[in-house]
């Protein structure tokens, strides 16, 4: 792994660990703080809202100051959030700690993804992007089991040492990064910045909306798939944890193979196909239930497609505004966090009036809408794209980082 990639990978692992730490400990936190599980769960909402708001300001900062400072600030803020959460004596302070964590997560995710565009030459970003996207699954595969073990053996408060330790590693990697500043990116004078630049560009705007819709559908599935397994197949929570880990492994595998796929197939078509494939499998998973092994195989296949879609789409997003990777990836962070909230809300509303079968078709419709939106996004890497010639003479200078 090339040295500049290490801080980017650690930043996304740290961000995801800061997000998912609540999943295994939410019941214990409620018992200790004398609060309901639903009340404690609002910490995830607070984190998401904070990350969305913070992303409005983080994108321009990355484009002005570079990736490295935001990686460091994000690691420090996420570490502080973990400490504040661990020592919180009551629910209000516990929720308040999520504001600090959410700001750190926004920095880590936005800068982590923007670093691929800022630190790697054009044409060499697909493989690093696969590592950065796939790194998020490490927290589910390794981090959550460790958090659960620490919670059972000692306390949920000590469990926050897991994301805290990863944040320390991310901070050290950022400080030791060989890249001092993203000097290779030259922005034209007077160019708009931040999310304003994103939403005034038609193609970048379509890409952002496509990500929002896709994350809403994907998150609705992730939020309720555990309940689906339990209610449909009467399996234990422990078994559900294993089943979800299988999906995370599939996601990681596919992110690392996306670079080779984008060399063989047109990137935009690959994203559209993966989105439609995800939607079709979601509909089948929640309507055809002969055996848990059958569902697990479909879930594995869907997670493979999710990894391909996420990795290829992130690269496409960076190419929308090559001179402003911070702004584009801040819009990705905002779309993802809003998607988490919308997905949980929409899924809950559907299940309140229908069942999992209907939810599957709703998610199919969502992924189809995302695919339609992506189909209208310009791909500078594609021959014949209206941005193709502009991409060749973009403000991104050829560069190599050892």
Residue ranges and their predicted role:
Residues 53-89:
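Conserved MFS/SLC helix-loop-helix module at the cytosolic interface between two early adjacent transmembrane helices
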Residues 123, 130-178:
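Helix-loop-helix hairpin linking two adjacent transmembrane segments in secondary transporters
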Residues 99-136:
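Cytoplasmic helix-loop-helix junction between adjacent transmembrane helices
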Residues 268-313:
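C-terminal transmembrane helical hairpin of 12-TM major facilitator-type secondary transporters
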